Amino acid sequence: MPNIKITDRLSNGETLLLDGGTGSELQRRGANVLKGAINKKDATSQQKTWAWSATTNIEFSDVVRQVHKDYLRVGADIIISNNFWTIPSRMNSIGLGDRWEEYATAAGENAVSARDEENPEAYVAGGIAAPTMQSLQEVPVPDIEYMGEKAFHKEYYDHAKLLADIGVDLILAEYLGFVSDSVAAVDACAEVGLPVFLGIRHIGQNGKMQYHNANQNNTTEETLNELAKALEGHPVDAILLMCSNPEAISAGLPIIRDSFNGPIGAYPNIGYNPTGPITNSPTLTNQLPSGGKDILQTQNYSPSRLAEFATKWKKTGAQIIGGCCATGPEHIMAMKPIVKD
């Protein structure tokens, strides 16, 4: 366990290196991250990710731990546990709802043990992704509206408490797309007594959030300014823009910097299709530790190109920089000199 609290390092002005994608890296290394992902009601319909990568925490635990270690070896200060969708609602979707705690515990323990073995001074962020059950609706609505306040709170609190008991250093409530969900998730996670970081997904290149607010037929996108205002007085220790393309993050960071009084960060998606096949990319054959296997489209954002974005983000004020879907250890290694300079 680290001797210095992560919040103290951020308060002192340090910039920390976050890890890269976990689920996509697991898939690239041959782990089955799509167990239960096909919509069984209609096998010809578009695949859904359901509990994407959750089952790997037990079935491919050695690969999960190795991915964590590889990120630490290239310099990551923070790794995110592979708890992305080990939450009850998502595990229910593949018939494993009664075992969610088993898979969630395995994910947390995999990350903590990898950290303890590789670099005890690194931080483990207990990652909890938004249920996004509203994505099943014709008109998306916030999870808290779809699930109800009580069920939403329990989903987050129970997961955060489990991870805190395992020994993670902070909670990362990530993949949030609505303001109301973001505020409620932060409040629930903070009850376990750890720092809480917030990850906002799929922002547009106009710097706005993913969804329109469907209430009252309001078709105005929620904004990052509105998010920051709504979070005033709530226990959020950092806001990160995530799972968005680098250009969108570049547009959004100045907005969140100017409206939020706290550390900000970025971890972009660089083109990964979670239900797509693994392909061989000769472009990256010599760069990938897996020997050339590449998830779709990453050749558009080489490690060196992503490092150029990291330079901009650091100048903008980002203190936590890493990667999301399709980024791998090679991307994090390329960003290290910029982030840690």
Model regions and ranges:
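Domain-level signal for soluble alpha/beta catalytic cores
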Residues: 1-341
